[in-house]
Amino acid sequence: LIEAVRAAEALNGCIIPLMTKTASLSAIQSAITDEIFYALGLGRRGVLRRGLGWVFALPARRFARHMAAVDGAVGEGGPAAGCQVMLDRLGVRVGARGADRIPASGPAVILANHPGAYDSMAIGSLIPRRDLKVLVGKTRFYEALPNIHPHLIGTSPARGDSMLALRAAADHLSEGGVLLQFGSGLIEPDPATDPVGDEVFDRWPPSMEILLRKVPETRVVPAIASGVLLPRFRDHPLVRLRRDAMDKRRLAEFMQVIWQLLFPKSIDARPRISFGQPFRVEDAGGDTRRVMPLVIAKMKAQLEDHLRWSR
């Protein structure tokens, strides 16, 4: 669900859409309710979903209205505008460092860690390019967002889907676009509250090797986000009902975003985003087999620098 918010993008290149489409509030609300049940471990379909969906009508309706506004802002002003609309509605103030390191043109990948919540909204609000695309997990939610959905690169754990997504991402880069990619695609610990060990980076797939092999002129910008998932939600008793660590973080981030939408002034949220120096495959001696070790080394160095700056 949160990844849907992260997906605010503009059309490819500098093309401005001739008409902004209007999202259906009922379709968005239905999709949001599906995601509520999924976050709780109850499934997006079934008897419970059909019988108890009304219980979440108020927060789902409120979220739907906000998402419709974000979708409209993306259609009119591009990804940064859409991201900023949601951040404003959440009452979030972003602290940033190094945003001027993002290439103004040409193929580029913003490679980031993934603590969840609104990390990509915070990052997206700092990317001034209209050709931004985001790699996201497939879900019905996106289909209810007409100005966002056409500009996503959807993927899933299925090998066929992941390869198609990488091909689409490579095509976008070859056309000179910018891509926002989260290392593993899974929710990870927030560096502001939890240690980020080697095991986190060990889960990152070698997708950058594939992309840089196909588009070697791509510049990669390491980015670190922190301070997005607050301890009061991470440690909430309801979160303990989920066993898997990633499911716990998914539920915590969902609860936090819903709470902030309902009570935007009740939380002083100040995420921190930092960007490192861009690098290319030539920094690995032109050998794509050495790209992932270089990528991981750059991300670890950026994490250390980020923690020194943000504390």
Q: Can you name each region flagged by the protein language model?
A:
Residues 1-18:
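N-terminal amphipathic/basic-hydrophobic helices that include classical n-h-c signal peptides
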Residues 133-136, 180-182, 219-224:
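A structural signal for short, well-ordered beta-strand segments and their strand-loop junctions
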Residues 18-108, 118-122, 129, 266:
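Membrane-anchoring hydrophobic helices of lipid-metabolizing enzymes
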Residues 165-175:
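Short amphipathic alpha-helices and their capping/turn segments at secondary-structure boundaries
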Residues 189-284:
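A cross-family acyltransferase "interaction/gating" segment
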Residues 175-189:
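A structural motif
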Residues 108-160:
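Catalytic core of membrane glycerolipid acyltransferases/transacylases, capturing the structured
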Residues 114-118, 186-188, 228:
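Gly/Ser/Thr-rich loops at beta-strand to alpha-helix junctions
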